[in-house]
């Protein structure tokens, strides 16, 4: 023993180093491998654990399959890119064409605008993607054999570093302006860009780009921005762009054909295209949205006439954005404190937004007001305010129309309808003929309704979109039949406050004249319809029962509706027009602030859950100790295809512990967790509206989500007005999801954080590029097609963001407090979600950051259970938005309200403590049921069945940590061996392994004990 002490004293350097390394590696290992939040974060960033087959033949259990021609990831990407290029072909909108397009064969063009080398392919944020390997403007021109001015291109390339658009704003930014990235005229010789045209004079293409992104809204001021007026806003031309257009369209310019390319996922002020500001040389304009990775290839085809444009706008393009009613209550309203609630003059942590405009959003305002102003003799009002109506789009071809039939459940429709006709299908068949002698083309027709309005009673838009259809490609002289379908129920209005005093609140159809019109756009629906059919009702219809579930429909948000005292009314536009909140409007009582707390909603102590709609007095028991694989007899694959209410679900859920349930619910970070004893696999559920992506991934080689299609923005997909193409998007996503992680463990991408279906409440919302349009019905129709197709491939789609998530500013500052009346909720903001549930069949929803009234949307029982689950019959899981704010996005409140999954690396609902009781345990069980039901009916179960056994092998980053541990351990042992060796003299036979081993054993015991 004395000798050992001597040896150890002689080797203090080795001992101290070894002890230090053990301490360091222990800390690293505990932090990275034992703290779920960090472990799950590293899994997301560097790659997840790998699924390894242990026994059985998974090929026996393939429940979902790719298309026959899709065999690999490259096949899936090729098909998806073809779909995306078609989105460009059918979505780019021809806004103006004074015989400027198509260009002549072998045309020579000059491209102007500094953003030509920094175009916007998608918005920024968690679902953005890179276009490094995509198709840019010049490759599109090359592919179309259009020659372009390379000298001019190179000149712009040199200007980029000095004048180009800066990096996108980041999450939470409130920006007082943002540079467009355009160069001033002073950057050119003699301040004259047109002088650089050379022989490339067939057209001047002018690129105008605007970005958008998650976490910030677009600025309504350009304060302190070079090249812009401080009183201008981001979505109009800045001075540099105006100067460029003036130069190119001046009498001294060599160009006679200037064509503007609008590269923006949201609408812009485009009055300059039509009002003659730039004379008669500005002859053409095309809106191209954000085209994704290869969508821009369609532009060259459209410029040459190989493809006839057939896109239509999904927003009303307004001449002056500051006339938009909803803009009076949006973002920070250019106030220093924004819409910040104050108590006794002191700021709080809460911000609010008032939807004072009610139902009058987008075309519902401009078409209704245009109609009422015309009745008053002010017919010029509409053109003074609107540049392009919703649904507008030009074509190279011309079309004629002939109505073939209009029927009610296949019978001739009567001029008077009854309650028994409420859900019968009204079908209109229209013959469309291409009367062009030259151009092939596709045409869009749109179906609108108009309901009787009674002064001072239920608010009604003069026109409402019901349906739309797009023809196949028609050759010159070719004709086809398109069908448009609706029901009487879809023409109902929601009377949230018994405005017509008939003692009924809910959906109603008033007596009076109703009209159905087929038109090219929302304005033509009442001003110049292709076809119009009038009918009346035998009596007022009050609708109390949901047509799908048979459940009662009734007000759920009276407290929210009543907060705003005056909503915009067509009975008095001027007197009820929204007003920007003043400091007085921001002052509230402390009682209101206290009502925002979690405790005020779910209760606490003796009041916890008492009198709440989610309260239960009994709940089934859970296991105390986790069952082994053999003890858990019911597996998740036994429930594939079973209804949500099948009794076997209880048998499955009875096998789980509370800990298993809370871990599943609390770790939904782009996945759902594995539960091995019931054969529930871990899933991969990536973002987003641009296609499968994961913004947290840092190493491409270990990423589980890679080599996927970069799809066009949803506003461009919407502009196709093509349901069949929206279905193809879902099918392409489905094929990509089924191939999944081809180079890794072959795990599918079974979930998708998309489509996003919020509306364009204002043009300034940062995420408008992620949403289809300003109209809820339109969004619902398009998204439902994508959802159906993806579901057919086993992909569950998290439809987001439910609900009233229409601005980014202060979105998660303890939950933006959103006030709105229930009519607008049910006629506009809820509709796309309702469609995707009832028509699309989605089994996943993402809730939103904001509050609806005082209650967080993701923990709002009336929203998630009352409307979504009970009224609409939704079955599946509801995930939160990314949850870094547990102070209000509380998982205990979430599960009580009907939420299921927390989008965070690790934030579990309670499994003990102040909020844990029988009601809570029942809520955990319901949430687990929701998640398991969704996953059971998805491609995540491919390869799972009787006799199949998988294990999870450590991810590569974990293997790296294990390897470092091993290398360090071996190094210390070798060092220790030779260090101790020196402590023996030659007579003591240093090679006596027993003595050396005794010295090393102290270290080894510690290491072995640790591992």
Where are these regions (language model features)?
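Glycoside hydrolase catalytic-domain context in secreted enzymes
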Residues: 1-503, 507-518, 522-523, 554-1011
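Short beta-strand elements
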Residues: 524-558
């Amino acid at each position: 023993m004395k000798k050992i002490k001597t040896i150890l004293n002689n080797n203090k350097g080795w001992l101290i180093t070894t002890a230090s390394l053990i301490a360091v590696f222990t800390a690293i290992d505990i932090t990275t491998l034992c703290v779920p939040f960090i472990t799950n974060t590293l899994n997301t960033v560097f790659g997840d654990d790998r699924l390894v087959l242990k026994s059985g033949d998974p090929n026996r259990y393939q429940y979902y399959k790719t298309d026959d021609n899709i065999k690999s990831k490259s096949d899936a990407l090729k098909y998806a890119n073809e779909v995306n290029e078609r989105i460009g072909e059918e979505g780019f909108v021809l806004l103006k064409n004074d015989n400027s397009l198509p260009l002549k064969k072998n045309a020579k063009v000059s491209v102007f605008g500094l953003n030509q080398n920094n175009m916007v392919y998608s918005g920024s944020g968690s679902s953005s993607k890179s276009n490094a390997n995509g198709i840019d403007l010049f490759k599109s021109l090359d592919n179309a054999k259009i020659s372009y001015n390379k000298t001019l291109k190179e000149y712009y390339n040199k200007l980029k570093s000095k004048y180009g658009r800066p990096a996108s704003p980041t999450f939470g930014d409130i920006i007082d302006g943002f540079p467009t990235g355009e160069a001033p005229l002073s950057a050119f010789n003699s301040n004259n860009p047109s002088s650089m045209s050379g022989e490339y004079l067939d057209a001047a293409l002018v690129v105008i780009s605007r970005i958008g992104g998650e976490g910030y809204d677009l600025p309504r001021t350009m304060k302190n921005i070079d090249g812009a007026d401080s009183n201008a806003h981001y979505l109009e031309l800045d001075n540099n762009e105006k100067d460029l257009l003036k130069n190119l369209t001046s009498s001294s310019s060599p160009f006679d054909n200037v064509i503007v390319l609008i590269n923006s996922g949201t609408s812009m002020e485009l009055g300059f295209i039509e009002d003659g500001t730039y004379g008669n040389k500005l002859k053409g304009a095309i809106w191209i949205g954000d085209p994704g990775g290869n969508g821009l290839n369609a532009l060259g085809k459209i410029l040459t006439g190989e493809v006839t444009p057939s896109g239509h706008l999904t927003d009303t393009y307004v001449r002056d954005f500051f006339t938009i009613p909803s803009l009076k209550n949006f973002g920070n309203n250019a106030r220093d404190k924004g819409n910040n609630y104050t108590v006794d003059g002191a700021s709080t942590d809460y911000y609010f937004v008032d939807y004072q405009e009610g139902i009058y959003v987008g075309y519902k305002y401009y078409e209704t007001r245009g109609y009422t102003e015309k009745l008053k003799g002010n017919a010029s009002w509409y053109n003074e305010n609107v540049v392009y109506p919703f649904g507008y789009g030009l074509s190279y071809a011309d079309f004629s129309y002939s109505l073939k039939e209009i029927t009610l459940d296949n019978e001739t429709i009567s001029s008077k309808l009854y309650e028994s006709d409420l859900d019968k299908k009204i079908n209109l068949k229209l013959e469309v003929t291409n009367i062009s002698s030259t151009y092939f083309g596709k045409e869009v027709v749109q179906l609108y309704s108009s309901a009787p309005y009674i002064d001072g009673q239920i608010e009604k838009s003069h026109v409402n979109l019901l349906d739309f259809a797009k023809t196949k490609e028609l050759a010159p002289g070719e004709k086809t039949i398109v069908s448009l379908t609706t029901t009487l129920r879809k023409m109902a209005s929601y009377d949230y406050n018994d405005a017509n005093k008939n003692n009924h609140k809910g959906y109603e159809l008033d007596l009076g004249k109703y009209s159905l019109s087929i038109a090219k756009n929302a304005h033509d629906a009442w001003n110049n319809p292709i076809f119009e059919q009038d009918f009346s009702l035998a009596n007022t219809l009050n609708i109390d029962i949901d047509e799908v579930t048979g459940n009662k429909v009734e007000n759920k948000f009276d407290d929210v509706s009543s907060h705003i005292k005056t909503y915009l009314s067509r009975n008095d536009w001027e007197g009820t027009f929204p007003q920007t909140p003043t400091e007085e409007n921001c002052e509230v009582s402390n009682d209101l602030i206290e009502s925002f707390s979690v405790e005020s909603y779910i209760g606490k102590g003796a009041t916890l859950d008492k009198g709440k709609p989610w309260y239960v007095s009994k709940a089934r028991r859970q296991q105390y100790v986790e069952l082994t694989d053999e003890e858990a007899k019911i597996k998740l694959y036994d429930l594939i295809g079973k209804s949500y209410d099948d009794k076997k679900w209880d048998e499955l859920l009875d096998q789980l512990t509370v800990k298993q349930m809370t871990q599943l619910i609390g770790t939904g970070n782009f996945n759902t967790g594995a539960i091995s004893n019931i054969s529930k696999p871990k899933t991969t559920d990536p973002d987003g509206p641009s296609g499968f992506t994961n913004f947290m991934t840092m190493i491409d080689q270990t990423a589980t989500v890679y080599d996927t299609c970069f799809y066009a923005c949803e506003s461009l997909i919407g502009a196709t007005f093509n349901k069949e193409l929206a279905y193809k998007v879902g099918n392409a996503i489905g094929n990509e999801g089924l191939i999944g992680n081809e180079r890794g463990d072959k795990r599918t991408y079974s979930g998708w954080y998309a489509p996003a279906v919020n509306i364009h409440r204002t043009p300034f919302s940062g995420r408008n590029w992620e949403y289809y349009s300003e109209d809820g019905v339109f969004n619902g129709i398009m998204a439902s097609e994508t959802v159906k197709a993806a579901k057919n491939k086993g992909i569950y789609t998290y439809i987001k963001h439910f609900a009233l998530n229409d601005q980014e500013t202060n979105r998660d500052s303890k939950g933006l407090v959103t006030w709105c009346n229930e009519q607008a909720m049910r006629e506009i903001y809820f509709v796309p979600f309702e469609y995707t549930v009832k028509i699309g069949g989605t089994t996943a929803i993402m809730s939103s950051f904001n509050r609806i009234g005082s209650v967080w949307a993701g923990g709002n029982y009336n929203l998630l259970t009352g409307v979504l689950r009970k009224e609409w019959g939704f079955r599946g899981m509801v995930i939160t938005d990314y949850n870094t704010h547990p102070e209000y996005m509380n998982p205990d409140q979430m599960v009580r309200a009907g939420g299921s999954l927390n989008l965070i690396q690790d934030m579990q609902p309670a499994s003990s403590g102040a909020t844990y009781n029988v009601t809570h345990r029942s809520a955990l069980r319901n949430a687990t049921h929701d998640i398991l039901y969704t996953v059971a009916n998805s491609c995540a179960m491919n390869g799972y069945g009787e006799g199949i056994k998988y294990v999870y092998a450590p991810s590569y980053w974990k293997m790296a940590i294990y390897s470092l541990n091993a290398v360090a351990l071996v190094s210390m042992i070798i060092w220790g061996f030779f260090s101790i060796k020196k402590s023996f003299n030659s007579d003591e036979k240093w090679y006596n392994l027993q003595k050396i081993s005794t010295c090393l054993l102290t270290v080894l015991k510690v290491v072995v004990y640790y591992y």
